[in-house]
Amino acid sequence: KKIGAIAAGSAMVASALATGVFAVEKIGDVEGFKVIDNGEPTADIVVGSTAAAADVVSAANVAAKVGSMMFKEGEAASGSAKLTVKASAESDDANLKSLLTNGTNDFTELDAGKEAFVVAAADSDYSDALINATTGFANIADNVLYDQAKLAAAVSLGDLSTLSVVKDIDPSDWYADKNKAADVATKDYYDQDGDAVEMLMATVASNDDGKSLTVDEDGVLYASIAYDDDNEDFQRATQVLKEGNRLPFLGEEYALVKLDTDDDIVYLGKEVFDGVLKEGDTYNIGDGYELKVVAILKSGDEYKISLQLMKDGKVVAEKFDKVSATSALKMIYTPGNIGIVVNEAWENVGQDYGYGSTLITKDVIALELGEEYIPDWEVVTIEKDTTTDNTKDSKMTLSDDKITKDNTYGIGLQYVGDEEDNFKSGKAIKIAKYAELELDDEDKEDTKLNLFFSMDETKEATLAAGQKVTVLNSDITLSEVMADAKAPVAFKAPLAVLDTEVSLDAANKKLILVGGPVANALTKELADAGKIEMTVESPATLAVVAGAANGNDVLVVAGGDRAATAEAANALIEML
């Protein structure tokens, strides 16, 4: 027979013994006896097979108490909410009917093929600064998004407020500050407080008919670009992306897990953990996945780390590699969409264990250069055309076939679909299923044909209590989950088993023995071995015998008679 608890946290026997409600004698480290770990019971509760009903009830009460704690812990830790975020906005517009000042005002009546370039960003300072005040062109290399010989105008459309910006790309300060972009005209700079900004760019061509435009393949770009803190100059202020940096991608904040220069893939993931793990630590990622830091080894000045990724207790992936600020350890497990970066390792003063600065991500996406992440939208990286140290005159270029780590300033999606040769008022071109490029003639007003970016987007985000996410340029923190919003969580309920079903020699977990030597065979075994002392005169007692159950600790809950055992059980329940 088995006596099961009715419910399903991490809890230790607390020092609530001081309540004084129940008088009980403590032997050993009673307060340190852990009964729940990570939502699961750590001990079997054992009652004698010939025990009186009172002892069986005591065991069931202990099991039920542990079970109720599991239920509360699980409910609090597992409570989450799915939120829907909706955002809509429009950028400034450019009236193509009065865009020019070089003798003719109407762009749409220029010779067919003449081009106009427009840009918007999460903050207008970035879009404004992309237009070169001296040349009138954008700071973009020729034939990347437009043909400079055909360009009639380059215009900033200010901000599209629903685009996203990450204000601190290196929240844990993994990388040391170098000279800031504003101070020197070289690529050798880095700012821990840098920003990453979403931008939209498009080139349209005149059809010389006064009412329609053409949008060519390769003429529209969505981009997420890293900048020096509060400096919006693309030529001087952009900074190279590094593993662990945060950046927005299609309205959500991601961490850069890996720039894979072998397969030319950019891996991005959503942060689960960013902090320090100690050698031997195991971190619960969720969905049955755990990351274990198996070992951190030092040879000279070099550190190597051994990691294991487990699913339901079984190792599904492992990595052993060196780690440093210039060579982070990266581990990606594609079946579980999990990405891990270890940026730095060190030892404690006594040199007997190590630590690793670790980022764990989930929902990892793989952006392969030259491939369509979304139909008609190809993955590119944002680069500069100047590869020497001097970048003061550098311009934006795009790469769709090769990742160059020291020349990657952002990631983008470039339009590679069919040419749109009849783009007119009332039509919209969807940009990466995220934003739109629109034309509006204000009800056929002869002097109006406004070109602008817009967004009307809805995204869902699932958050645990206390978690923060950035969605569509909104920071959202879930402070709590109300009871009626929580779904039931399944746990393995603790069971009271009989002393004939478990032995001290073969136990695979801790044991809680309810009943004295007369009522419980395992308690008698401990008494006969001299590990506890208990007679018919013994008071209510809680005694911990370290390692007595096949190396696992044993907690004896007993007394000299049934009443004393019940009192000991009630004292334990009071302390939990």
UniProtKB/Swiss-Prot annotation:
It holds the Pfam family S_layer_C. Residues 1-23 form the signal peptide. GO terms for cellular component: extracellular region; S-layer. N-linked glycans consist of the 779 Da trisaccharide beta-ManNAc(Thr)-(1-4)-beta-GlcNAc3NAcA-(1-3)-beta-GlcNAc. It is found in: Secreted, Cell wall, S-layer. Its main location: secreted. InterPro entries: S_layer_C (IPR022651), S_layer_central (IPR022650), S_layer_MJ (IPR006454). One of its GO terms (biological process) is cell wall organization. Glycans are attached at N102, N132. Keywords: Cell wall, Cell wall biogenesis/degradation, Glycoprotein, S-layer, Secreted, Signal. Belongs to the Mj S-layer protein family. NCBIfam families: S_layer_MJ. S-layer protein. The S-layer is a paracrystalline mono-layered assembly of proteins which coat the surface of the cell. This is S-layer protein. It comes from Methanococcus voltae. The lineage of its organism: Archaea, Methanobacteriati, Methanobacteriota, Methanomada group, Methanococci. The gene is sla.
